[in-house]
């Protein structure tokens, strides 16, 4: 049985369920979600906007090492009040609880929407051949309140590392699709992050020697416009899938 304990917040969401299925062999898994399903000893119902609920959950998991923080409002068009409470306040609450409980590392689900305005409004960069790659060194250009909330989450992660030594990896996640099919939308040909590349990226983010980093989460798509060279060199991310090579569903 794995000896390192991992808590996944937002464990019932799309990314949470993918990670839960594929990381169970590597970590002793625990989950946190605002929604309730069948009772399980290793999944806790909690609201991340309520610090006492987070602290109570972490207090019930002795020797917890890692957190993958996915919980929050995932809507790209979410209003300010929601992202302020759930994504900004909720992320701050997770990091503060992690600090208080001696967690080693948090992997924070940031988003490509931290720099979404580079794609154009509405997005059109995916229609261009050989565009300049967007890197983590480019200035932030969020394309809405959701993007702002993820920029703020990255800043929270940085502060908790600099002030308290709480290790963090921030992943600017691309398009993770329920059916794992990048051909349902032209933009996905550029932005798709396959399920197996997602799992690899998160696992390597948890175990890498790097103490803090920000990386784009995207497969090795021929038409991608996000730079992953730092993820390759720093955490040994080796994406296996390319939207241009994936099988199209039979009509």
Residue ranges of predicted features:
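N-terminal Rossmann NAD(P)H-binding glycine-rich loop of SDR-like oxidoreductase domains
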Residues: 4-25
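NAD(P)H-binding glycine-rich loop region in Rossmannoid oxidoreductase-like domains
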Residues: 38, 48-86
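Glycine-rich NAD(P)-binding loop of the Rossmann-fold in SDR/ketoreductase-type enzymes
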Residues: 49, 66, 82-93, 101, ...
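Catalytic helix-loop patch of NAD(P)-dependent Rossmann-fold dehydrogenases
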Residues: 85, 121-168
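Conserved Rossmann-fold NAD(P)-dependent oxidoreductase catalytic core, especially the SDR/UDP-sugar
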Residues: 93-140
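Flexible, glycine-rich beta-alpha linker
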Residues: 114-116, 145, 163-189
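Alpha-helical substrate-binding/gating segment
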Residues: 162, 173-180, 192-213, 220
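Conserved C-terminal active-site "lid" loop/helix of NAD(P)H-dependent oxidoreductases
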Residues: 213-215, 220-238
């Amino acid at each position: 049985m794995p000896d390192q304990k991992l808590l996944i917040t937002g464990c019932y969401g799309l990314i949470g369920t993918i990670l839960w299925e594929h990381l169970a062999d590597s970590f002793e898994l625990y989950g946190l979600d605002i929604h309730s399903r069948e009772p399980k000893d290793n999944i806790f119902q909690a609201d991340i906007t309520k610090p006492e609920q987070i602290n109570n959950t972490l207090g019930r998991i002795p020797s917890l090492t890692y957190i993958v923080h996915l919980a929050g409002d995932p809507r790209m068009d979410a209003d300010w009040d929601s992202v302020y409470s759930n994504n900004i306040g909720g992320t701050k609450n997770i990091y503060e609880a992690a600090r208080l409980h001696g967690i080693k590392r948090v992997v924070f689900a940031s988003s490509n929407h931290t720099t979404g305005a580079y794609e154009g409004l509405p997005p059109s960069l995916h229609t261009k051949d050989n565009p300049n790659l967007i890197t983590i060194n480019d200035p932030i250009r969020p394309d809405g309140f959701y993007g702002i909330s993820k920029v703020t989450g990255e800043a929270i992660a940085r502060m908790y590392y600099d002030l308290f030594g709480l290790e963090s990896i921030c992943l600017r996640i691309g398009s993770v699709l329920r059916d794992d099919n990048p051909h349902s939308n032209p933009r996905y040909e550029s932005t798709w992050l396959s399920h197996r590349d997602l799992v690899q990226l998160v696992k390597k983010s948890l175990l890498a020697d790097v103490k803090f980093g920000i990386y784009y989460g995207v497969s090795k798509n021929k038409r991608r416009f996000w730079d992953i060279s730092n993820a390759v060199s720093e955490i040994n991310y080796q994406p296996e899938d390319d939207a241009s090579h994936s099988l199209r569903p039979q009509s």
